């Protein structure tokens, strides 16, 4: 049986565009196949969901605070009116531990992101030469992808 998806065109497009919007069939399988191909080409990969991302640059790359859920009546004198803020390490911190490898951040459910959040992902890629980002933007009958900047122009400018 011939290899249906070698990943060569995907790899070339990823290198030239740095940020891709991908549309994969809903039955799945293509994502893991492409990730396996990218790992074989020397990428360090990290998969996470885009839901609840907030400010992508802060959430993925910087130390930020998160308030725990409210668990009923608590003493106001201890933590003030706003409550306790816990410091959380960046979600993609394990991706940035190695500086010598190319890095691939794969975001699932990217259709929930706004135009400004998608644009900030493109800015993150331009700041770090070794970082590439793939955002799954929904389902399709066949595997398709385009640059994230072209997707923003097509989707939001009309």
Curated annotation (Swiss-Prot):
It is found in: Cellular thylakoid membrane. Its main location: membrane. Keywords: Membrane, NAD, NADP, Plastoquinone, Quinone, Thylakoid, Translocase, Transport. One of its GO terms (molecular function) is oxidoreductase activity, acting on NAD(P)H, quinone or similar compound as acceptor. Its EC number is 7.1.1.-. It is an enzyme of class 7 (translocase). It comes from the Bacteria. InterPro entries: NAD(P)H-quinone_OxRdtase_su_N. NDH-1 can be composed of about 15 different subunits; different subcomplexes with different compositions have been identified which probably have different functions. NDH-1 shuttles electrons from an unknown electron donor, via FMN and iron-sulfur (Fe-S) centers, to quinones in the respiratory and/or the photosynthetic chain. The immediate electron acceptor for the enzyme in this species is believed to be plastoquinone. Couples the redox reaction to proton translocation, and thus conserves the redox energy in a proton gradient. Cyanobacterial NDH-1 also plays a role in inorganic carbon-concentration. Belongs to the complex I NdhN subunit family. This is NAD(P)H-quinone oxidoreductase subunit N.
């Amino acid at each position: 049986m011939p290899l249906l998806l070698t990943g060569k065109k995907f790899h070339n497009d990823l290198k030239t565009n740095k940020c891709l919007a991908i549309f994969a069939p809903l039955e799945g399988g293509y994502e893991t196949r492409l990730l396996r191909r990218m790992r074989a080409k020397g990428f360090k990969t990290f998969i996470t969901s885009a839901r609840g991302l907030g400010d992508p640059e802060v959430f993925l790359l910087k130390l930020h605070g998160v308030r725990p859920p409210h668990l009923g009546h608590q003493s106001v004198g201890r933590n003030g009116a706003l409550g306790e803020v816990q410091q959380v390490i960046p979600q993609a911190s394990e991706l940035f531990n190695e500086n010598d490898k190319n890095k691939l951040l794969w975001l699932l459910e990217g259709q929930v992101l706004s135009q400004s959040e998608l644009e900030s992902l493109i800015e993150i890629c331009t700041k770090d030469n070794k970082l590439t980002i793939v955002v799954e933007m929904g389902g399709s009958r066949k595997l398709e992808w385009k640059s994230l900047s072209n997707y923003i122009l097509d989707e939001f400018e009309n």
